[in-house]
Amino acid sequence: MMKFTVVAAALLLLGAVRAEEEDKKEDVGTVVGIDLGTTYSCVGVFKNGRVEIIANDQGNRITPSYVAFTPEGERLIGDAAKNQLTSNPENTVFDAKRLIGRTWNDPSVQQDIKFLPFKVVEKKTKPYIQVDIGGGQTKTFAPEEISAMVLTKMKETAEAYLGKKVTHAVVTVPAYFNDAQRQATKDAGTIAGLNVMRIINEPTAAAIAYGLDKREGEKNILVFDLGGGTFDVSLLTIDNGVFEVVATNGDTHLGGEDFDQRVMEHFIKLYKKKTGKDVRKDNRAVQKLRREVEKAKRALSSQHQARIEIESFFEGEDFSETLTRAKFEELNMDLFRSTMKPVQKVLEDSDLKKSDIDEIVLVGGSTRIPKIQQLVKEFFNGKEPSRGINPDEAVAYGAAVQAGVLSGDQDTGDLVLLDVCPLTLGIETVGGVMTKLIPRNTVVPTKKSQIFSTASDNQPTVTIKVYEGERPLTKDNHLLGTFDLTGIPPAPRGVPQIEVTFEIDVNGILRVTAEDKGTGNKNKITITNDQNRLTPEEIERMVNDAEKFAEEDKKLKERIDTRNELESYAYSLKNQIGDKEKLGGKLSSEDKETMEKAVEEKIEWLESHQDADIEDFKAKKKELEEIVQPIISKLYGSGGPPPTGEEDTSEKDEL
């Protein structure tokens, strides 16, 4: 029976792929694949029959998922933002993925807030990020907006490489993300001006990257994906280009950052013991420690000890300690071991033995930790994980292949993706019981209906409460949404027939309908976590904000450029006047004095007017040119070379 369902699902999906081909008549341009990570993001594109992972403007193929606001009002994204974390910790935002789609009361949010250097506040029962955006202005951002800024950076990285606009993308999420987190990620794409054609699960994307060129026979593949902030395990079968997820499990709140945190806590305690001082009071010191601990952790993947040296760490004192691999492992051993539980669960759910697994694929930067590799190897009785895949880039690689399929690229072959819903979905029935409609690990897209009835006589309304989770009582599961079906004609309890239908689309997003079979009366809800999700108005406002920010960034850059032009013009003149070999030796003392005075005046003005407008900078430069040009012309005869070796903007203006 199960085999039949899968085949049916495959046909269903092939149908969906065909339907997609119909949709494809609209030109989507080049679709990019984006791995939106907790700590780093990565973008790829399918071009000329192969995937290109695109380097950013710093030449790096992965970009930190960081956004910062400087005191001057400049917004930095990526490497530039991460590089100034220690000098501006309160206004450097990271880890938005740990907050996205969660409520304020979520225990993991409350735990995270303790360690984040920026301010997280409650707004509409959700965590919002509050920062100073320069000029004494404070602004709150939804986690979706911060993620949107990172997505914008990835979009621009792709555009710079492709030389054209990018409007459509495939974005990946942890397989264990729930409905709210998926929907919020889609919203982030919208705010960034991207049409997110498909949300795909990270381990599935990694499996595509691994298995794309492996066409022989059916294989069982276990993907173990441990990144900066999330952990997923998925078991897939790959058979001639058909990728079917059989089971998935994980923890959306476990990753490299948690390992860093353990080491930081260890050193903070140690420092207090040695000096009696509590470093936690100093945000900058904590962020310096964070940066150095992360470096040491990376070093320990290839060596047995690393030194952590921080100059003027706290109250002017230096910090110098050694971290050994053994100590690092001891501090994190419980977390490392906890990664084996989901592996066990996935095997149980798919009715497979350890020996049935053909390949183990390690994904995510944290799988470079030797202890993690050892635990995985021991769990599978000494089987070596497969090595042929870059753990940082695999997810973006797979997303780019899926993007190639969606943009109708012929070279992707007949790739078919069968994914599953990670959590059981159901409704609450009398006594707070969770009645399951779609069990977890059901292949999506899927549709399931069941008939329910009323609990009391003449009941005019039924309230449908939709939950996700594995526990038998709804109070222990996660409420997705609630809606009412009204206008049920009076009848004894148990007589009315109410058909409840659950339908999940390819993005794993759920729609629930309820219909009174007697009257044909219908109501439906697309589970978009109304209480937890941005409204269309909010999304529109955020899209406008994002455009405004981009505009402001552009203006700010122009202002800085014109300021720099004036500054380099003035200093270049100053140097030449002071150089006896150049201008200085050719000017009359009167002209020299006039020029020196004019140049000094502009340099002084610049020092006290850093925040002037573009127009002011231009005007001051023009004033200076009006004094300098006649003197130079007199000296060289008109049409002579300009005074500075590099600047000839005045000539350009004349054209």
From Swiss-Prot:
A GO biological-process term: proteolysis involved in protein catabolic process
Modified residues (N6-acetyllysine): 126, 214, 272, 327, 354
Residue ranges of the region described as Nucleotide-binding (NBD): 126-281
EC numbers: 3.6.4.10
Motif position, Prevents secretion from ER: 652-655
Induction: Induced in sinus, lung and brain tissue in response to 3-hydroxybutyric acid (BHB)-induced acidosis. Induced in sinus, lung and brain tissue following intraperitoneal injection of streptozotocin to produce a mouse model of diabetic ketoacidosis (DKA).
Name of this chain's protein: Endoplasmic reticulum chaperone BiP
Annotated organism of origin: Mus musculus (Mouse)
